[in-house]
Structure formats: C-alpha cells, structure tokens
Amino acid sequence: MVHFTAEEKSTILSLWGKVNVEEAGGEALGRLLVVYPWTQRFFDSFGNLSSASAIMGNPKVKAHGKKVLTSFGEAVKNMDNLKGAFAKLSELHCDKLHVDPENFKLLGNVMVIILATHFGKEFTPDVQAAWQKLVSGVATALAHKYH
C-alpha cells in the first residue's frame, strides 16, 4: 500500500484541479502508442495508427485517452485505497484484455511527462515526486489481479 503525506495529497489535488482531462488524456495515450509502439496491439479497432501524426490526431485515441485519465481521477479521489479503487479495472485488464502490467508503468511515466510539459515551472521536483508516487501506486494497483 502506498502512503501519501498530507503535503503530497495536497500537491496532487492542487495540480489535478487544473488538468484538462480531455487534452492531457489524449496526449498521454497518443504518446504511449508512439513511444512504445508494441502497445498499439491493444488498439486494433482504433483505425490508422501508422504514424505519430495519425496517432496524435486519431479521435478514438483521444476519446480513450480521456476515458483513461478520467478513471485516473479515481486515484486522486482514493489515494488511501488505490487497490480497491482499481480492483475492477485490474481484473478487466488481466482476465479479459490481457494487457502486460508493465504497460501501466509506461503510461504512468508518460503521464508525468505530459504534466511536466503542461505545467512547466509549476511542476517542481516535489510535485513530480508526488505524482511519480501516485502513478507508481496506480500501476501497482492495476497489476494487483495478475497471477
């Protein structure tokens, strides 16, 4: 279980309130698919993923990215119970979708990069440390149902 200090929680909540979920979600998933192309195999139904520009402009990538980041909002609301908050998604990704749990770590790291680019100087090392802790906790929670 991940333990967050009051300061870390405050830092995460403060920044999360400023995140444009639609924009950041689409960008995060798009970058994941570009930087780690083997992750594209889970998105065969998304159409054209042949180039970085095709991926970043793909409406299905943007829509699913928004969905992913919206569900990530559950982590922000449930920092003290990440495993519980992501139990159903963990089961889905393990039993039905067969997603390699390493991909959760990759997406979390891409999310941190997106936040850094969107918030610039506001994304201090302390802010990054809090967010890195959160995305790591989410990745662990999502991998929980894997055998």
Curated annotation (Swiss-Prot):
Keywords: Heme, Iron, Metal-binding, Oxygen transport, Phosphoprotein, Transport
Highest taxon of the lineage: Eukaryota
One Gene Ontology MF term: haptoglobin binding
Sequence ranges assigned to domain Globin in this UniProt record: 3-147
Keyword Heme: yes
Phosphoserine: modified positions: 14, 51
Gene Ontology biological process: hydrogen peroxide catabolic process
Tissue specificity: Red blood cells.
Positions that bind heme b: 64, 93
Pfam families, alphabetized: Globin
Record text on subunit structure and interactions: Heterotetramer of two alpha chains and two epsilon chains in early embryonic hemoglobin Gower-2; two zeta chains and two epsilon chains in early embryonic hemoglobin Gower-1.
Similarity comment: Belongs to the globin family.
Protein name: Hemoglobin subunit epsilon
